[in-house]
Regions:
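Short, Lys/Arg-rich flexible segments
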Residues: 1-83, 100-103, 107, 111-170
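Extended Gly/Ser/Thr-rich low-complexity repeat segments
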Residues: 84-100
Length: 170
């Protein structure tokens, strides 16, 4: 028995295919944008969780997140030095427990700037008294949150594309 497969092409069928592909491309692009925005917000929430877990929740109001619709990019950041010191670590304790990714903007980070070493130093506390420390280990809340999102990004993208593309998604 002979099997025959035929396919008919016409101007109309090609125009319909083009419409379908354009619709798919727009929906796919929107899904990717939604995934970036959602992942940015998730990372922000994970940073907050790590801050609470490390006992620095009173500084979380200084952590921000933003999604730029024009650039289609998101970011999570802070200018709060307490959070930055906790992220990177300080003193002899920090140099013995450094940040797992000392590259980028913190490549030149110095743990024991004033060379206090084992003797440590006094610092003013919020209640007006002074505390003593040898420094802080790196608690890397931002780095850990980024690693978490990096591990989840495939699922995030898949879900967001399915939401926008729907039945068109393979």
């Amino acid at each position: 028995m002979k099997t025959l497969l035929t396919m008919e092409l016409s101007k109309k069928s090609l125009e319909e295919a083009k419409k379908f592909l354009n619709k798919y491309q727009e929906a796919y692009s929107k899904g990717i944008d939604n995934a970036v925005k959602y992942a940015t917000e998730m990372m922000y929430n994970k940073v907050l969780e790590y801050c609470y877990a490390n006992g620095i929740s009173n500084h979380t109001s200084q952590i921000q997140w933003q999604y730029d619709d024009n650039a289609k990019s998101g970011r999570v950041w802070t200018n709060d030095m307490v959070i930055i010191f906790n992220e990177m670590g300080t003193g002899i304790v920090g140099s013995n427990n450094p940040h797992p990714n000392p590259d980028g903007p913190f490549k030149s980070w110095k743990y024991d700037v004033n060379e206090h070493g084992e003797k440590g130093w006094k610092y003013p506390k919020e209640d007006g008294t002074y505390g003593w420390t040898k420094g802080l280990p790196s608690r890397h809340m931002f780095y850990s949150a980024f690693q978490d999102i990096k591990n989840e990004i495939g699922n995030i993208v898949d879900i967001e594309i399915r939401k926008t593309v729907g039945d068109l998604y393979w």
